[in-house]
Amino acid sequence: MYEGVQVSSKLEQLQGLLAPVVVALGYQCWGIDFSSQGKHSVLRIYIDKEGGVLVDDCAIVSRQISGVLDVEDPISTEYTLEVSSPGMERPLFTIEQFALYAGEQVRIKLRSPFEGRRNFQGLLRGVEEQDVVVQVEDHEFLLPIDLIDKANIIPTFD
């Protein structure tokens, strides 16, 4: 996996390059994830739209994004491009997305320990400035958004 600032700058570069393409096609760019394990890298682009995303939507976006990536060549290593909907276990990338899903159960993994922990699972209470508020059992944690590596909604079936 890329480390710290390198990840942030690579993601910012990809976001700036690819999000406008997704938006121009009529979709919301929900988020971008770029991960690398050994020699294999994966670029995941999550798209959304009113009424949901179909396989054809992913194919349309994938073709356009592939063209941009071929021309701009922002990734120097081999990688796999994946375009998908956020799905039921929707990943959360921005402070606005965390605010939108307040009241939902979440799973959060941090880049480095916070109060002795890296993994949190509990109720997303909301946001306070640049902190995500999560209640785990009877304890509330204010997690700095910059420390969050991955966060997903945990679907509940009532």
From Swiss-Prot:
GO terms for biological process: ribosomal small subunit assembly; translation. The keyword Glycoprotein does not apply. CDD domains: YlxS_C (cd01734). GO terms for cellular component: cytosol. InterPro entries: Ribosome_maturation_RimP (IPR003728), RimP_C (IPR028998), RimP_C_sf (IPR036847), RimP_N (IPR028989), RimP_N_sf (IPR035956). It is found in: Cytoplasm. Disulfide bonds: none annotated. It comes from the Bacteria. The keyword Cytoplasm applies. Gene3D superfamilies: Ribosome maturation factor RimP, C-terminal domain (2.30.30.180), RimP-like superfamily, N-terminal (3.30.300.70). Keywords: Cytoplasm, Ribosome biogenesis. Its main location: cytoplasm. It holds the Pfam family DUF150_C. SUPFAM superfamilies: YhbC-like, C-terminal domain, YhbC-like, N-terminal domain. Belongs to the RimP family. Required for maturation of 30S ribosomal subunits. NCBIfam families: PRK00092.1-1. This is Ribosome maturation factor RimP. It comes from Pseudomonas syringae pv. tomato (strain ATCC BAA-871 / DC3000). The gene is rimP.
